[in-house]
């Protein structure tokens, strides 16, 4: 640039810069090209800055004219850059969407449908049946104390169930519950009779694993406490439940013994030509009621317990309890 410059020369440079900017911006194909143009036109070392730098050689009264024209051009270029950027971004998005178009007519690979585990559905069916009879669901901890698991249920200290060969002891006074009956005691401590509850849950016993036994399995306990309950109410409840669950299978009651019920009975159903035990039940022993501060002369009740695995195996014709725990999808997908 010469040592002297005129107002007309700078004005001509700004006009030429405007024309070049308009043409270059319109031809820019992507955001990177627009950014390069912005730097070359409006950057600190850009062409507009060069023109403004030469403005100092003009007489003071002419400088505002050049400055005003340069500001207008700068605003114009910024607007053109912004508008063109939106255009190229929209074009890039449209091109990407075109390339990524999904063919909705193409055959789908299919997503396998999940299945609820048969133990879960069996438990829910049992609980639903008793809920329909007016029973409320109750739950309790799986880690229990000796008191709730044994003593409060009238199980004496010399009873075989207390032996370490049958129970998982955790140290101190704690153990893994061997049945869900402790839920009944805990519930009665907090809720005065009359009560009707059904208590599903996981239980633990030191059983060897075979086709019919597992150290971890599931039980459902039923308890009813009210005035005037007798064995006929127990029998009627059990019969109604078994008919609803199994249909018209033959059922029989056999006299038995449980420390916390008296009289006690085991319940069998006829399955595959033989009698199969499915439940234990009985009238709540007066000693259990007295331990809870209830007058056995006023209150009576019955309790029943069943193994969910046994009910599930009978319902679905499963011959080995271990099948329920293998997580073999070929087996589980049948349900």
UniProtKB/Swiss-Prot annotation:
GO terms for cellular component: cytoplasm. Binds 2 magnesium ions per tetramer. Its main location: cytoplasm. It holds the Pfam family tRNA-synt_2d. Mg(2+) binds at residue 262. GO terms for biological process: phenylalanyl-tRNA aminoacylation. It is found in: Cytoplasm. One of its GO terms (molecular function) is magnesium ion binding. Its EC number is 6.1.1.20. It comes from Prochlorococcus marinus (strain MIT 9313). PANTHER family: PHENYLALANINE--TRNA LIGASE, MITOCHONDRIAL, PHENYLALANYL-TRNA SYNTHETASE. Belongs to the class-II aminoacyl-tRNA synthetase family. Phe-tRNA synthetase alpha subunit type 1 subfamily. InterPro entries: aa-tRNA-synth_II, aa-tRNA-synth_II/BPL/LPL, Phe-tRNA-synth_IIc_asu, Phe-tRNA_ligase_II_N, Phe_tRNA_ligase_alpha1_bac, Phenylalanyl-tRNA_Synthase, tRNA-bd_arm. It comes from the Bacteria. This is Phenylalanine--tRNA ligase alpha subunit. Keywords: Aminoacyl-tRNA synthetase, ATP-binding, Cytoplasm, Ligase, Magnesium, Metal-binding, Nucleotide-binding, Protein biosynthesis.
């Amino acid at each position: 640039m010469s040592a002297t410059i005129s107002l007309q020369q700078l004005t001509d440079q700004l006009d030429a810069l405007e024309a070049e900017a308009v043409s270059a911006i319109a031809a820019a194909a992507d955001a990177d090209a627009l950014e390069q143009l912005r730097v070359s036109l409006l950057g600190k070392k850009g062409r507009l800055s060069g023109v403004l730098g030469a403005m100092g050689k003009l007489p003071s009264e002419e400088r505002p004219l050049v400055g005003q024209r340069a500001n207008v051009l700068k605003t114009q270029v910024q607007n053109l850059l912004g508008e063109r950027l939106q255009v190229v971004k929209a074009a890039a998005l449209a091109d990407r969407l075109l390339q990524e178009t999904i063919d909705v007519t193409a055959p789908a690979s299919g997503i396998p449908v999940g299945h609820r585990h048969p133990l879960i559905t069996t438990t829910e069916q049992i609980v639903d049946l008793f809920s329909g009879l007016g029973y409320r669901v109750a739950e309790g901890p799986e880690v229990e104390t000796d008191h709730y698991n044994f003593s409060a249920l009238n199980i004496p200290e010399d009873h075989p169930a207390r032996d370490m060969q049958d129970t998982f002891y955790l140290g101190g006074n704690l153990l893994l519950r061997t049945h869900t009956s402790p839920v009944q005691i805990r519930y009665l401590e907090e809720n005065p009779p009359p009560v009707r509850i059904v208590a599903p849950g996981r239980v633990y016993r030191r059983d060897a694993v075979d086709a019919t036994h597992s150290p971890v399995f599931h039980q459902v306990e039923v308890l009813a406490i009210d005035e005037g309950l007798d064995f006929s109410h127990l029998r009627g409840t059990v019969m109604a439940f078994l008919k609803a669950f199994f249909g018209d299978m033959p059922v029989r009651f056999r006299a038995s013994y449980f420390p916390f019920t008296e009289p006690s009975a085991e319940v069998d159903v006829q399955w595959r030509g033989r009698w199969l035990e499915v439940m234990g039940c009985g009238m709540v022993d007066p000693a259990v009621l007295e331990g809870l501060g209830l007058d056995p002369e006023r209150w009576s009740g019955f309790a029943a317990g069943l193994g969910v695995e046994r009910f599930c195996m009978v319902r679905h014709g499963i011959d080995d309890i271990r099948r329920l725990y293998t997580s073999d999808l070929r087996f589980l997908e049948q349900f």
